[in-house]
Amino acid sequence: MAVYLLAVAILFCIQGWPSGTVQGQAMSFMEVYERSVCQTREMLVSILDEYPSEVAHLFRPSCVTVLRCGGCCTDESLTCTATGKRSVGREIMRVDPRKGTSKIEVMQFTEHTECECRPRSTVNNGKRKKNPKEGEPRAKFPLV
C-alpha cells in the first residue's frame, strides 16, 4: 500500500495535481489568462429567474446549466457581451403543489454561442444607454 501511495505521489509531482498545477506551485500566467478571458462558459441559471411568471410551480432541478458569456476584458471600460445566441431545451420536472401533480417537460433557455468585449457605455441589458446632453448634469440627486 505504501508503495502505491508513493507511486501516486510521484506521478502527481511529474504530471501535476488534478487542478492542473503541482501542489505548492502557482498556476501559470498563461493558464490563468486563458481561463479568465471573455468566452462562453457553463453557468447555472435559476429557472425562476428565466421564467419569473411561473411562481405557482416548483421545478426540479431548480436551476439548469447553459453556456453564457463571462470573463474579463482587457480594459475596465469593456464588458463581456453575448454576440450570438440560440435556444436550447432542458428536461425539467414541473411540480404543481396545489394539485399534487408533476410532469417532465422540455423548457427552453437562451444559451450564448459567441462573446465579445464591448464598451460598457453602449451595453445596458441589450439597450443603448442614453448619453446626457451637453450642459446637462450627469446625475440628478434629490435635494435634502
Curated annotation (Swiss-Prot):
Quaternary structure (record): Homodimer; disulfide-linked. Interacts with VEGF receptor-1 (FLT1) with a high affinity, whereas it binds to VEGF receptor-2 (KDR) with a low affinity. Does not bind VEGF receptor-3 (FLT4).
Which Pfam family is an annotated match for this chain, by its short name? PDGF
What the protein does comes down to: Snake venom VEGFs that may contribute to venom dispersion and prey subjugation by inducing vascular permeability and hypotension. This protein induces an increase in capillary permeability after intradermal injection, as well as a drastic hypotensive effect after intravenous injection. The hypotension is mediated by nitric oxide (NO), which is produced by VEGF-activated endothelium NO synthase. Also induces angiogenesis in vitro. Like other crotalid VEGFs, this protein interacts with VEGF receptor-1 (FLT1) with a high affinity, whereas it binds to VEGF receptor-2 (KDR) with a low affinity.
Signal peptide start-end: 1-24
Q: List the protein's name.
A: Snake venom vascular endothelial growth factor toxin cratrin
Record family assignment: Belongs to the PDGF/VEGF growth factor family. Snake venom VEGF subfamily.
What is the reported tissue distribution?
Answer: Expressed by the venom gland.
In this chain, where does the modification Pyrrolidone carboxylic acid occur?
Answer: 25
Q: Which GO terms describe its molecular function?
A: chemoattractant activity; growth factor activity; toxin activity; vascular endothelial growth factor receptor binding
Please name every pair of cysteines joined by a disulfide bond in this record.
Answer: 38-80, 69-115, 73-117
Cite the InterPro entries for this sequence: Cystine-knot_cytokine, PD_growth_factor_CS, PDGF/VEGF_dom, PDGF/VEGF_growth_factor
GO CC terms, sorted: extracellular space; membrane
